[in-house]
Amino acid sequence: MKTRSLISLLYLLLCSCSSWLPPLEERTESRHFNTSKPILLDNILQIRHTPHKNGLSDIYLLNDPHEAFAARAALIESAEHSLDLQYYIWRNDISGRLLFNLIYLAAERGVRVRLLLDDNNTRGLDDLLLALDSHPNIEVRLFNPFVLRKWRALGYLTDFARLNRRMHNKSFTADNRATILGGRNIGDEYFKVRNDTVFADLDILATGSVVNEVSYDFDRYWASHSAYNATHIIRRGDIPHGLQELGYDDETARQALLRYRETIEQSPLYKKIQNRQIDWQSVQTRLISDDPDKGLDRDSRKPPIADRLQNALKQPEKNVYLVSPYFVPTKSGTQALAKLVQNGIGVTVLTNSLQATDVAAVHSGYAKYRKPLLHSGIKLYELQPNYAVPSTKDKGLTGSSVTSLHAKTFIVDGKRIFIGSFNLDPRSARLNTEMGVVIESPLIAGKMERTLAQTTPSYAYRVTLDKHNRLQWYDPATQKTYSNEPEAKLWKRIAAKILSLLPIEGLL
């Protein structure tokens, strides 16, 4: 009887969790910085287009992880008025802490900082986030936060519908003059701090029209019904400890940070910024972003992002190149791709192999569609783990020894390219909020398409069917053909097979 009563009491307590969310009326209103007066970033980045010039932006592709970090550091260090930062993941590791420190120093010199983080990956950051928020020029908000900070998983028992919807957006904007958006989160694996785990990813550094679009989009999310003040959610935190973390209290961590900073200062982009010689590409751009109400499953005034992305990329005439680390095409998506092939459109897909993926459940959702995709005539490639991709801007998606694919980019007819956070899976389409930019540029899209066509066969398995309709993986480096998932241990193959039997496709 006592056990039943305790269980009932625990359930009632858990059911009340969602009601513990603080009132949104306690938030202060703010909007992005806006001025036409010359500022430091205009000179540092040699900005040629104002944020209000319709559709025209200057972009610089960030395929190298060290350049990707250098760009972010440069924006923080050059900012005079505001920093608006929106991320799904911000890790408390070498790169994450270094950027946190630079942000704090920016606030010290008077820069207003708005930091919006999805709360799904902030475990262990509470002290540091409170320390940041304690600065009068920094405000931290959490998207769809967990009320229970220590026992977060319990929140899913009673608030699953809300907590299952995450903010997957990634943007990094300084003074409403320059922005970075694409696939990278903030963490060592995205910036090649160590060699054990490196993600092949892609961002753009941009000035011009797209910056204003990103700034207005950030304002929408900042004021959304899912964004809560961190101080109202984190009720127990140690601010002095968080300040110590910001100050590199650990000597080993401090030395690692200094070494990485030295590496960044040797990157080509860092030197280009110092010399005011960034080789910009002037292009037409269009921001594609979800309505933040998607985070609460509310009706949006905008069509789903997948529909708007398809409209922006337009109907293909010759070929489509799809790069998606998490690729779950679903039955309808597989049929749509097959129809393109039937109409004479070449379709190529690059995704992760089982051994390369960091989410085996997603791979299990994709695996069952491989045969239908291949039967329809789609070219299918799976990234090999631990393959050294060439380190120049003309080769591949990144310059590093890659352990996993994380870039999300789609190229249509060598004329239009999408770079952003959107994966070709049900979660991106229906559950998470996403964003990215469509770039109209035969020069950039065509070059990326040719580069992928030339280099992908050298670092990815070509998946085909043998004469008995069985899957096989061809490794061009060794000229070896595998009959099972290459390099994946038996237990991993079994786990993926079991996961494929579960009715979880809509969550992947």
Describe the residue ranges of each PLM region:
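Charged, low-complexity intrinsically disordered terminal segments
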Residues: 17-168, 174-508
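Bacterial N-terminal signal peptides that target proteins for export
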Residues: 1-6
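Bacterial N-terminal signal peptides
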Residues: 7-16
